[in-house]
């Protein structure tokens, strides 16, 4: 893997698929995709106090943090990706929002499509947002 960011939709989906494949070849840890700070400031519905949106993938599981409102959007999105299922929802007493773990038993390209849809539709990012691979 030689590139670590992308901003065009097709490039982002390829970045996710390549990152997931590289993660699988390494066989340990997780891969984290994080939205660029400039893209966060361009998003109208994101609360900057909640931090930068990110999505992690490891061992067939997607991990995201979201608000209750974003969780409802995520559930709606999952209806379009029937192979993906919520495994666990964790609510912390110390922090607002929820952590969601989603079973993602699919090929890297399909997972990449889902990850891009999470950023665009759950977090409400504009079409041309930049995402980085920040941990592999």
What are the residue ranges of the model-derived segments?
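Mature extracytoplasmic domains of secretory-pathway proteins
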Residues: 56-86
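Residue-level "edge-of-site" marker
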Residues: 90-92
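Helix N-cap motif at beta-to-alpha junctions
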Residues: 67-68, 104-109
């Amino acid at each position: 893997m030689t590139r670590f960011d992308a901003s065009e939709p097709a490039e982002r989906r390829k970045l996710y698929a390549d990152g997931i494949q590289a993660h699988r070849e390494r066989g340990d840890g997780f891969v984290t995709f994080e939205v660029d700070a400039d893209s966060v400031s361009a998003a109208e519905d994101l609360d900057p106090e909640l931090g930068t949106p990110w999505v992690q993938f490891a061992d067939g599981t997607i991990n995201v943090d979201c608000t209750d409102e974003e969780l409802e959007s995520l559930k709606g999105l999952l209806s379009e990706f029937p192979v993906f299922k919520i495994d666990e929802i964790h609510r912390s007493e110390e922090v607002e929002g929820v952590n969601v773990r989603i079973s993602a038993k699919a090929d890297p390209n399909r997972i990449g499509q889902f990850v891009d849809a999470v950023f665009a539709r759950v977090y409400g990012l504009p079409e041309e947002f930049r995402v980085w691979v920040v941990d592999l």
